[in-house]
Amino acid sequence: MDQLPELVPFLLEPKSEIKLLALQHLLGVSDNQEARDILKSTQIINNCIKLITDSNHVVVRHALTILINLCQDTDMLNDIVKKNIVPRLVDGTTDTKNKMSEIFAMLLSNVTHTKEGCLSLMQCGKELEAFFIMKLVQVLTMDSNQEDYFKSTKNNWIVNIILNVTQIQEGRKIVLDKENQIFKEILPLVRHENVIKRRGILGIIRNCCYSEQHHDYLISPEVDILTKLCLPIRGNDKLDDDDLVGLHIDLHNSSLPIGNERDQDRECRKMVVESLIFLTGTKKGRVSMRTAKIYPILRNLFNFETEEELRDNVEKVVELIIRDEEGDPTPEEIEQMNKKQKLEDEDAQFETDEI
C-alpha cells in the first residue's frame, strides 16, 4: 500500500503499456478506503481526469472507473467536482457514438450527488444555463418514436442525474421551466417497463411536487400531473358509472389497455402517493384533486395495499380531498401530515437516494 503513490506519475507515461499497468494496479485498489486515504495526497484525480480524453479506450475506461471508485470518499468526491469535470462528462454521456457513454454517465451521477456538482451541471445564472441538462434530456428522449422506447434499458443513469438535480431548488426551477419543456418531455416515461427508469422518473415528479410555487404549472391542463400520477396506480379495477363522472378519460375503463395492471413495484406506488401528499400542500392542489375526482382510484389503491405505511399515506390524501372547502385543514395540520415526507432542500444537508 505504501508504494501506491509511486504509481501515480506513471499514469501520464507516454508508453501505453506502462500507463495501462499503473492503471490496472490502481484500479484494483481504488475501491479500498485504506488505499484511497493513501492516494489523497497524490495527483491521482488530476491524472485520471486527463486520461478520460485518451485515444486508448481501455485507458479511458480504467480512468473513469477509478474516478467512480474514488467518489466513495467524500473528500475526493468534492475534489473531483472542483475540477470543472462536468462539461467533459456531459460530452461523453451525450455522444451517441461513444461506447462508454454509460460509464461517463455513472461518474456524472456521482458528481451530482453533491450540490456543487448539480449547480455546475445547471450552470445557474450563466450563459449556458440549462444547456447541459437539456442535452441529457435530448439523449434520453431521442428514441421516443421507436417501438422499444418503453422497454430500452439505455440511459438509466441520465434519469438518475436528473433525479439528483431536482433535489435542489435551482434544479427544480430549471426542470420545471415552461420554456425548455424538460418536465413534459420525460413524463411519458412513467409508463416505462424498466423499474429503475420508472423509479427515477417518479422520484423526479415527487421532488418537483415538493415545490409549492410550481403547483399551478403541475396541475395545469398543459401538464395534468394528477392524471399522470394516477395511471401507475389505476390498476384494472372496473369503476362504476358514478365513479367515472368527472374522471379523466384516460382513467376510464374503456381507455385502459387489455391486461392493465397497477404498478407492481412498491417504491413506485409509494412515490406516487408521496407526490399527491405534497400536492395537498396548496389550496389549488386540493381543489384540483377534488375536481379531478380521483377518490375512486385512491380508494381502490387503499384496498390493494397491505403495508400499513402505504395505506396510511393513501388515507392522508383521501382525508384531505373529501373535506368540504370551508373545512380545509390549517397549514399546521398539513405540515403535521407531511412531516414524514419532508425532502432535503437547498438549505439542508444534501442527500439523494439511489434508484
From Swiss-Prot:
Signal peptide: none annotated. Residues 325-335, 344-355 have a biased composition (Acidic residues). It comes from the Eukaryota. SUPFAM superfamilies: ARM repeat. InterPro entries: ARM-like (IPR011989), ARM-type_fold (IPR016024), Hgh1 (IPR039717), Protein_HGH1_C (IPR007206), Protein_HGH1_N (IPR007205). Coiled coil: none annotated. Residues 324-355 are annotated as: Disordered. Belongs to the HGH1 family. This is Protein HGH1 homolog. It comes from Dictyostelium discoideum.
